[in-house]
Design a protein with these regions (language model features):
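ATP-dependent carboxylate activation and anion-phosphoryl transfer catalytic cores
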Residues: 111, 198, 237-324
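Active-site nucleotide/adenylate-binding loops and adjacent lid/helix of ATP-dependent enzymes
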Residues: 1-7, 52-54, 97-177, 184, ...
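Catalytic cores of histone-lysine modification enzymes
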Residues: 324-411
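Phosphate-binding site of ATP-dependent enzymes
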Residues: 158-239, 243-246, 267-274
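Residue-level "contact hotspot" at macromolecular interaction interfaces
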Residues: 155, 338, 344, 423-426
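ATP-binding N-terminal substructure of ATP-dependent carboxylate-amine bond-forming enzymes
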Residues: 1-87, 93, 97-98, 121-129, ...
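C-terminal SET catalytic tail plus cysteine-rich post-SET Zn-binding segment of SAM-dependent SET-domain
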Residues: 406-483
Length: 483
């Protein structure tokens, strides 16, 4: 295994976080692997990654967690790796910096309790927050993590204190989130996606933070300059252990979670669990007194830092492999374009995974009423009938197009919304479909020149040939014919 560990070069910034983020050494966690450390400069991130992409690394372990406001590599690392199609650990651009209001919404939809809250975008919102929320109220930035902007004055007991706290940080950190304070115990839970099944995750042993004297909540200093390692203890309450894991799993999967994440929860005097927030770019792999919450989870969980590293590497590689297309587009303006296998394919392998994927839908009525004649002709050639009146059409993003040609002797076919191979296919062979098997009477007929021994000549769609009709036939359920 050849691994490149990406860490931030702080030479471009004066942000104080650099003093609490020492270089992390991972080689001892996986002695059999080749582990190289590279420090990314904010000014040259893309160029550095482009060169690193030529060195044959199996995976990039990304430990760059800079905020958008910092002169430190952050989401741009994921953006560059996605452009360069490199395998990586962590969430990618989609979940890099999730707003707290979205966190609350996802948790709520997953059936996990959340504190009542108000988003404060200006001083005008202070009075509304004071009227709708029960004091005491906790005030924090709506986006930043690591308790940035949080100090001893973040817990307020009346409107005057709320206004004072908001006015002090809204210019730098706004918008803000004001939420009803949940007095009680605080727990952190670490979650990681699984390599073998993207719909599952592993939840590690929760850790409770026992606040040092004089503190009721975590501030920026408690997470950076004033660490208290003895305050982190494993959860020994079997009920809370089980329920915290269940809540964390629901939220992670609710986000379509990828990589790993750390979540904070509060438990009140009624033993009710309330979700606070999630960090998909949580710090990890620290030693020598710099350990963060995730490291304490790994200290108390049997997997340890070594096992966790291997877990997230396997998940990152598997995730990258799943998104790799098994074909390339070839062609020119003279002979046209087609798609060709870029590796040997087994029978039954996916060429496209349309199931559970966001795709463009349109009604026939909408097309007939609003589309130009040229667009209607394209529709008749390529629209995929979901039902008699609803069709799936091509993506707005041309990089997602796949000009798969017709053959009367095809080597792939639709299975529901997926396209799968019908037989083993050699690398370099064109991937074809029989258009008549998945298009209906709206299809534009054409003369076939595929050259197959069984070539039918004129190709036409079949009546009542929609996904709905075919799925019903598979279930042996008779659907009344629409007239």
């Amino acid at each position: 295994m050849k691994i490149c560990v990406l860490q931030p070069d702080y030479s471009t910034t004066k942000v104080d976080y650099q003093y609490y983020d020492p270089p992390r050494q991972l080689a001892h966690l996986w002695p059999d692997a080749q582990i190289d450390n590279v420090f990314l400069n904010k000014l040259t991130t893309y160029r550095q990654l482009k060169e690193l992409g030529k060195k044959g690394y199996d995976i990039f372990v990304n430990l760059c967690e800079g905020y958008l406001e910092w002169e430190v590599p952050g989401v741009d690392v994921y953006y560059s790796m996605e452009l360069l199609n490199l395998p990586y650990t962590g969430p990618g651009t989609k979940l890099y910096d999730v707003p707290k209001e979205l966190m609350k919404y996802v948790a709520y939809c997953q059936g996990v309790k959340i504190p009542a809250y108000i988003v404060i975008e200006s001083m005008d919102d202070v009075k509304k927050a004071a009227q709708k929320l029960n004091f005491p109220v906790f005030v924090k930035p709506e986006k930043a993590g690591d308790s940035l902007g949080v100090d001893r004055h973040s817990l307020v007991y009346n409107e005057e204190q709320l206004a004072s706290k908001v006015s002090g940080i809204i210019e730098e950190y706004g918008p803000l989130l004001a939420e009803e304070y949940i007095a009680g115990r605080e727990f952190t839970v670490l979650v990681a996606g699984n390599a073998e099944n993207e719909k599952t995750c592993t939840v590690f042993r929760p850790v409770e933070y026992l606040f040092p004297e004089g503190y009721e909540f975590k501030t920026y200093s408690l997470k950076t300059s004033e660490l208290h390692p003895d305050c982190n203890v494993p959860c020994r309450d079997k009920y809370l252990d089980r329920e915290l894991r269940k809540a964390a799993e629901k939220i992670f999967l609710g986000f379509g979670g990828a990589g790993y994440a750390r979540m904070d929860f509060r438990v009140n005097d009624k033993n009710e669990i309330h979700f606070l927030e999630v960090n998909f770019t949580c710090s990890v792999f620290y030693t020598d007194g710099y350990e963060g919450s995730a490291d304490f989870v790994l200290k108390f969980d049997p997997i340890g830092q070594s096992g966790f590293l291997k877990h997230i590497v396997a998940e990152g590689i598997a995730r990258h492999q799943r998104k790799m297309k098994p074909f390339v587009i070839k062609g020119n303006a003279i002979s046209g374009f087609g798609i060709y296998a870029n590796r040997d394919l087994r029978a039954g392998e996916f060429i496209f995974s349309g199931e559970e994927k966001a795709q463009r839908l349109v009604t026939l009525r909408h097309v007939e009423k609003n589309w130009s004649e040229d667009d209607k002709e394209t529709f008749r050639r390529y629209a995929y009938p979901i039902s008699k009146e609803v069709f799936l059409i091509w993506d707005n993003d041309p990089t997602e197009w796949a000009p798969q040609n017709h053959s009367c002797d095809p080597n792939s076919a639709y299975n529901g919304l997926n396209v799968v191979t019908l037989r083993p296919i050699a690398k370099g062979e064109e991937l074809t479909l029989d258009y008549a098997t998945f298009l209906d009477k709206n299809m534009q007929p054409f003369h076939c020149l595929c050259g197959a021994p069984n070539c039918r000549g004129l190709i036409m769609g079949m009546p009542n040939n929609s996904v709905t009709e075919r799925e019903a036939r598979l279930k042996k359920v008779r659907v009344p014919r629409q007239r």
